[in-house]
Amino acid sequence: MAFDQAYYQRFYFNRRTAVTSRSEMRARARLISGCVDYIGLPVARILDAGCGVGMLRSPLLQRLKRASYTGLEFSDYLCQRYGWQQGSIETFRTRQRFDLVICYDVLQYLSAAQARRAIANLARLCRGALYFGALTREDWRDNCDQSRTDRIPGLRPGSWYRRELASAFRPIGCGMWVKREVPLTLWNLDAAA
């Protein structure tokens, strides 16, 4: 799949065909920042892996005022347009660790082997919380507006992602995961099932 100007025009810039909106991303940023605040996680560094057009950047930085933001993006077009760091979450390397890592709607584009390597890398890069989402087989069938979503062959079930993430992360709900070593008491009904 070509993540070029035509792709982003169709799925992000054209309001009639866009997969999301700025208002949805502002709400998502409120959710993310509210979760890290609730669990008492100070956030100094954010990695947005697959940041796309950067719709989370401003609303997150408005709420997490002491944080710096690193946008990692695979698309040459977006890196040239927005100045993101070019790379893939599967192979991205840095000495920095991030308090908050975001990887949303990225891994469904990778093969299972690539996605496993990406999840291992997310675990290496994250020292606090992960906000994670991927289009699953169940979402394609039951939830998404297929006229506004690109067709991705080989979608995996949600159980695949939960199983792969579980070795390094604990789910706390609403797409939020915390590293297993983070000292956090999760009450039984507060935690994701």
Task: Tell me what each language-model feature is.
Residues 105-109:
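Short catalytic micro-motifs in class I SAM-dependent methyltransferases
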Residues 1-96, 110-117, 121-124, 128-193:
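Class I (Rossmann-like) S-adenosyl-L-methionine-dependent methyltransferase catalytic domain
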Residues 102:
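A conserved beta-strand element that flanks and buttresses the S-adenosyl-L-methionine
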